[in-house]
């Protein structure tokens, strides 16, 4: 109550922020006549002037009014488009590390040019982030003329681009790309083996389009760079065969309950669990398939991986549906994004789930992958010094943006008042009744010439509606992941009079639906159109546009509520753009997933009490409230999951930052010999301490064990026992010094053979490879730890604290292993004298000649022989071949230098 009174007096925080920013809008407007007087050359020279002022210490914020005025005037000259005052407000919000909520059709793409230009003046690079490659390319090409007019370079970062092209894109003042590609480039840069391989600069300013889609919907999706693990495709196929024998466990209070089934399903948590009866049957079937021995338990330690395969196969069959969660195209299982309905080419589910789905669909099973590097979007985008974003629907997630990303959400007012009519939801008992009602509504409205957009939550549902429309004889277009290539054309014409378009999740589509259709699309189909043709097309469009407005504008039909209110609002937001007329309504049934899982019992009882008849809909505030509560429940649960994910990932993030910092320092120096010497001292001290405890009696020393360890791990022959027998006066400290000095002498002799430069490069290479290998193993160990850490709760321990404690111990152990393995590898490497290499090469040539004379071998036998032992190589050592000394370097960079 008190807060409401205070808000009325002082205004909300949103109002106060906009009031402050409007003062700057007035300043920019006053500068407009001055900018109009400037010639093109004088306007373009402003960029250099601003940069000079920044170098002299002027703050970026002080330049804002002038810079925005320059962009506004340049846009008028280049595009013939003037930034509205609300777009200037949006630009200021984006410059202040905030989220700007701007409704669909308010010109977010043009708004982004303002903060992008201002922050590009620093020369530190601006990253504009979009949800897909099409939008990245479109926005970059659309805005390129403006930025180039102002003297700024524009780069596009697309998947599959070679490193030099990516480096050039990142070197540009403003770079457009997708969230995935920016994240993957960051990971790849931190796997590089030379500074030249890196493509990104230091992360400065990210401007994220559809920020809710990227920072919230995809927050649970980690970016993973992986390498192939062992092939277990046969096991997936065998396990897949047993799943159809299992029966689902029904609820005990349901009509179909007939005793215990083999597995139960928790739809809320998306989990499947075997029952006792199911476990017995699975074990019997696995024994029958010859996968498991008679009498073995699926839960025994030796069968943990087998249990993992069974769970993955069960989830693939029960929780993942074709044309909902994925599609099968050209013999490949492609994931469908649950939020946008787009296919995610190249993405794969982890933990063997993707292979299980491939086995279920009987397509080629690709090998499982092992994680080499990974990061979540939450942690990647928090690496930027400055982060901002824009979307049409952010206010419902304002708390999450604030608590996780420290970003405030500011709702920017529309340029014209919103007049769309949002009609109350209609709820039916069955799915079929709901579909019938939707078809009737479409018939009535399309006859009047009103365009209709039908939003569905999956490809499967879009095809159900499509079939019903075909049956009713209503012409329509379908926009889903299966017709991805036709997207731009379908959306461009969705606003035509009487057009019916079915779309799977309009979130992140990035294209406005213009009433009367898109006249620009018509012009684009003409070859070299003249001004007269363009004028005719515009005039015809104006007539169509007015007719559609008279019919009521674009009507939105939602076929069911999404888990998130924000996705529903995005669908609604496609109508009523820029003050146009429009309407929206959601049709629901008690068989919808959201209603069935979260709101079914209460609403079903309510509908029964109201005496519902078949085909009759309920339209009541109670029902709307129950649905809103169900959505809030899901949103709250999803937020908790994302928050928990972040808390766990923050532990890995700190370790990742430490490893990547150390790795980059390694890359940037050419000589790490001092580091190697320091590590060697630590390793030998620790090793000797294990066998000769400090300040201990000689009787406690294990000299034989130490000799064996030095031989096995460091290739050092040291007769320690003989030294002690021969020199009774040899005490502990002197012995330690002798062991270390002899190890150092052996290493220096190797260095003399290959040369200082080769050894420095080799040390660096060994350090990087060992670090990468151990980091990869550490990531896998962290995954395993995380999967089972929740069980610590049963022992009255906090799983998060346990995870932090254990992961820190694992990290410390990994760093110790790094030191040990680096010194062990460097000690074991065999180097050869130049004359030995010549003798070896002569021997290889003779062997090759002998093999060439044996003509009786078939080609196949010859091939198998040549790919066998290296001693049977049939050609001289090439300059790019591995050096025979075992250093791992190319011959030309190692002993090949000595042959010159």
UniProtKB/Swiss-Prot annotation:
* Cofactor: how bound: May bind 1 zinc ion per subunit.
Membrane topology note: Peripheral membrane protein
- Which PROSITE patterns does the entry mention? SECA, SECA_MOTOR_DEAD
Which positions are annotated as binding Zn(2+)? 883, 885, 894-895
Q: Which CDD domains match?
A: DEXDc_SecA, SF2_C_secA
SMART domains hit by this protein: SecA_DEAD (SM00957), SecA_PP_bind (SM00958)
Pfam families found in the cross-reference section: P-loop_SecA, SEC-C, SecA_DEAD, SecA_PP_bind, SecA_SW
* Record-listed ATP binding positions: 87, 105-109, 512
The cellular location(s) given in this protein's UniProt record come to: Cell inner membrane; Cytoplasm
Q: Which NCBIfam families match?
A: PRK12904.1, secA
Q: How does it assemble?
A: Monomer and homodimer. Part of the essential Sec protein translocation apparatus which comprises SecA, SecYEG and auxiliary proteins SecDF-YajC and YidC.
* Annotated protein name in UniProt: Protein translocase subunit SecA
Q: Report the source organism.
A: Pectobacterium atrosepticum (strain SCRI 1043 / ATCC BAA-672) (Erwinia carotovora subsp. atroseptica)
Chain's gene name: secA
């Amino acid at each position: 109550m008190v807060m409401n009174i205070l808000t009325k007096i002082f205004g909300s925080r949103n109002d106060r922020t906009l009031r402050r920013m409007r003062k700057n809008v007035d300043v920019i407007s006053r500068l407009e006549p001055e900018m109009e007087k400037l010639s093109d050359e004088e306007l373009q020279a402003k960029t250099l002037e601003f940069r000079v002022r920044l170098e002299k210490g002027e703050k970026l914020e002080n330049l804002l009014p002038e810079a925005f005025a320059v962009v506004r005037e340049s846009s008028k000259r280049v595009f013939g488009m003037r930034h509205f005052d609300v777009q200037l407000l949006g630009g200021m919000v984006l410059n202040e590390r905030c989220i700007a909520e701007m409704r669909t059709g308010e010109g977010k793409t043009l708004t982004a040019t303002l903060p992008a230009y201002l922050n590009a003046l620093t020369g530190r690079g601006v990253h504009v982030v979009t949800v897909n490659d099409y939008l990245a390319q479109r926005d970059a090409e659309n805005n390129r003329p403006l930025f180039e007019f102002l003297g700024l370079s524009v780069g596009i970062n697309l998947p599959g681009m070679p490193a030099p092209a990516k480096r050039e894109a990142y070197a540009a003042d403003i770079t457009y790309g997708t969230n995935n590609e920016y994240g993957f480039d960051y990971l790849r840069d931190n796997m590089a083996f030379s500074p030249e391989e890196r493509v990104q600069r230091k992360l400065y300013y990210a401007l994220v389009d559809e920020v809710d889609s990227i920072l919230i919907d995809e927050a649970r999706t980690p970016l993973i760079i992986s390498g192939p693990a062992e092939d277990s495709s046969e096991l997936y196929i065998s396990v897949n065969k047993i799943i159809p024998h299992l029966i689902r466990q029904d609820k005990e209070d349901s009509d179909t309950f007939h005793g215990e089934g083999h597995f139960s399903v928790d739809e809320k948590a998306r989990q499947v669990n075997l029952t006792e009866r199911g476990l017995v049957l699975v074990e019997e079937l696995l024994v029958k398939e010859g996968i498991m021995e008679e009498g073995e338990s699926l839960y025994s330690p030796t069968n943990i991986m087998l249990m993992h395969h069974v769970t993955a196969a069960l989830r693939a069959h029960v929780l993942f549906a074709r044309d909902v969660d994925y599609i099968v195209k050209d013999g490949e299982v492609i994931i469908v994004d649950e939020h946008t309905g787009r296919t995610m080419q190249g993405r794969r589910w982890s933990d063997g789930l993707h292979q299980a789905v491939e086995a279920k669909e009987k397509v080629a099973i690709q090998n499982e992958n092992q994680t080499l590097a990974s990061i979540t979007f939450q942690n990647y985008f928090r690496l930027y010094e400055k982060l901002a974003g824009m979307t049409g629907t952010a206010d419902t997630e304002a708390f999450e943006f604030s608590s996780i990303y420290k970003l405030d959400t500011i709702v920017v007012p529309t340029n014209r008042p919103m007049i769309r009519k949002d009609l109350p939801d209609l709820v039916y008992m069955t799915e079929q009744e709901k579909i019938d009602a939707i078809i009737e509504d479409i018939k009535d409205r399309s006859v009047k010439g009103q365009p209709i957009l039908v939003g569905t939550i999956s490809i499967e549902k879009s095809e159900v509606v499509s079939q019903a429309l075909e049956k009713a004889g209503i012409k329509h277009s379908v926009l889903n992941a299966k017709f991805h290539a036709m997207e731009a054309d379908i959306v461009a014409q969705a606003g035509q009079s009487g057009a019916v378009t079915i779309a799977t999740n309009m979130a992140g589509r990035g294209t406005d639906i213009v009433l009367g259709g898109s006249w620009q699309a018509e012009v684009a189909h003409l070859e070299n159109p003249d001004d007269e043709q363009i004028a005719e097309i515009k005039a015809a469009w104006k007539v169509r546009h007015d007719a559609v407005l008279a019919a009521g504008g674009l009507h939105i039909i939602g076929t069911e509520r999404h888990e998130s209110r924000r996705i529903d609002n995005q669908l609604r937001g496609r109508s009523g753009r820029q003050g146009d007329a429009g309407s929206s309504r959601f049709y629901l049934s008690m068989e919808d997933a959201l209603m069935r899982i979260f709101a079914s019992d209460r609403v079903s009882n309510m509908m029964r009490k109201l005496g519902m008849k078949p085909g009759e809909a309920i339209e009541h505030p109670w029902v709307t409230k129950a649905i809103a509560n169900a959505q809030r429940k899901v949103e709250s649960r999803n937020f908790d999951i994302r928050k928990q994910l972040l808390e766990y990932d923050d532990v890995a993030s700190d370790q990742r930052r430490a490893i990547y910092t150390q790795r980059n320092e390694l890359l940037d120096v050419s000589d790490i010999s001092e580091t190697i010497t320091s590590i060697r001292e630590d390793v030998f001290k620790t090793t000797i301490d294990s066998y000769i405890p400090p300040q201990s009696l000689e009787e406690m020393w294990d000299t034989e064990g130490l000799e064996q360890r030095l031989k096995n791990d460091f290739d050092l022959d040291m007769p320690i026992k003989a030294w002690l027998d021969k020199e009774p006066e040899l005490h502990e400290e002197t012995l330690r010094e002798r062991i270390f000095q002899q190890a150092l002498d052996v290493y220096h002799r190797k260095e003399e053979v290959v040369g200082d430069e080769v050894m420095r490069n080799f040390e660096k290479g060994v350090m990087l490879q060992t670090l990468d290998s151990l980091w990869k193993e550490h990531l896998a160990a962290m995954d395993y730890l995380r999967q089972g850490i929740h069980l610590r709760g049963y022992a009255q321990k906090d799983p998060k604290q346990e995870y932090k404690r254990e992961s820190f111990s694992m990290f410390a152990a990994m760093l110790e292993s790094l030191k040990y393995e680096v010194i062990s590898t460097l000690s074991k490497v065999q180097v050869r004298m130049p004359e030995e290499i010549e003798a070896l090469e002569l021997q290889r040539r003779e062997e090759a000649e002998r093999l060439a004379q044996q003509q009786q071998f078939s080609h196949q036998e010859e091939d198998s022989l040549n790919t066998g032992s290296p001693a049977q190589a049939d050609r001289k050592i090439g300059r790019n071949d591995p050096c025979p000394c075992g250093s791992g370097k190319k011959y030309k960079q190692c002993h090949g230098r000595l042959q010159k």
